[in-house]
Amino acid sequence: VLTLMRYAWGMVPEKFTTPLGKTIIVDKSHASESIVPLDMAREVIRVARMSAYAQLCELPEEQRANYQTLMRREEAKSKWSDQQMLFINQLHLFTVMTLTGKVQLVEKDGDKQVVVQEGKAAKTESCTDTERKKVQDQIMAYVNSAPAPAAAASNAPPPPASPPSKRAEPTPTSQKK
């Protein structure tokens, strides 16, 4: 995980303009302000692994849905800075590229450098129908599951109904003298 994070950080640009025209400036001398915690990086890599399998199995819709679900969930948390969201994006991208053979680590002058392979992915293993179905099922389970914090509360539909009644309970408690 730390190795993928390090190489993904190397791919983060100092200046990035989103499709909506928003410019994100990244201070590369302060990585700690842009890199996400290890547990979040593990989640990004886990999702990226499924995106890579979808790409190898030629399931572009599932790959896109998997990635978009990750990014939307993280945006909805309003927890990450623009720089951290850019890092999450780059970590996902770098992981997918690594697993699909589009990135190689090449040793040059005693240091390892990332080399992006242009054109078709180097790994061209084809998926069986069984593997393709398994990848589809796993991605759809992720896409259709509740976001991680809500999923920890067990069943997604009942909890939203019960918290409003619980919110009404603290009022009498707060009226104590």
Q: Where do the protein language model's features map onto the residues?
A:
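Compact alpha-helical subdomains of small soluble proteins
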Residues: 2-16, 26-29, 60-177
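Mid-chain, structured segments of secreted extracytoplasmic proteins
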Residues: 29-72
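N-terminal, post-cleavage mature segments of outer-membrane
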Residues: 19-22
